[in-house]
Amino acid sequence: SYQRFLFLVVVASLIATSLAIPKDLEKRGTTCYCGNTIGIYWFAKKTCPSGRGYTGSCGYFLGICCYPVD
């Protein structure tokens, strides 16, 4: 009974979290630096978003820093 309740709480939390995540993950990130070059930090991405004019990137904490900034 307790395990069943805990399972239902976890499932409900996962559903609520998935509904709260924005559908458009291509929103502008925050400022980051690739050496002396200023870029835009994208969390949990392995590549820069396409169609935004980025010409380079560097790995950044749990994401990527893409430059140049427009």
Curated annotation (Swiss-Prot):
Propeptide stretches are: 22-26
Tell me which GO cellular component terms the UniProt record holds.
extracellular region; nematocyst
Q: Which cysteines are joined by disulfide bonds?
A: 32-65, 34-58, 48-66
Originating species: Anthopleura elegantissima
Q: What does this protein do?
A: Potently and selectively inhibits voltage-gated potassium channels Kv11/KCNH/ERG. Acts as a gating-modifier toxin that shifts the voltage-dependence of ERG activation in the positive direction and suppresses its current amplitudes elicited by strong depolarizing pulses that maximally activate the channels.
Q: What else is known?
A: Shows significant expression differences between stressed and unstressed A.elegantissima.
Q: Which domain of life is it from?
A: Eukaryota
Position of the signal peptide? 1-21
* Keywords, comma-separated and alphabetical: Cleavage on pair of basic residues, Disulfide bond, Ion channel impairing toxin, Nematocyst, Neurotoxin, Potassium channel impairing toxin, Secreted, Signal, Toxin, Voltage-gated potassium channel impairing toxin
Q: Where in the cell is it found?
A: Secreted; Nematocyst
What GO MF terms are annotated? ion channel inhibitor activity; potassium channel regulator activity; toxin activity
Full protein name: U-actitoxin-Ael2c
The record's similarity note reads:
Belongs to the sea anemone type 3 (BDS) potassium channel toxin family.
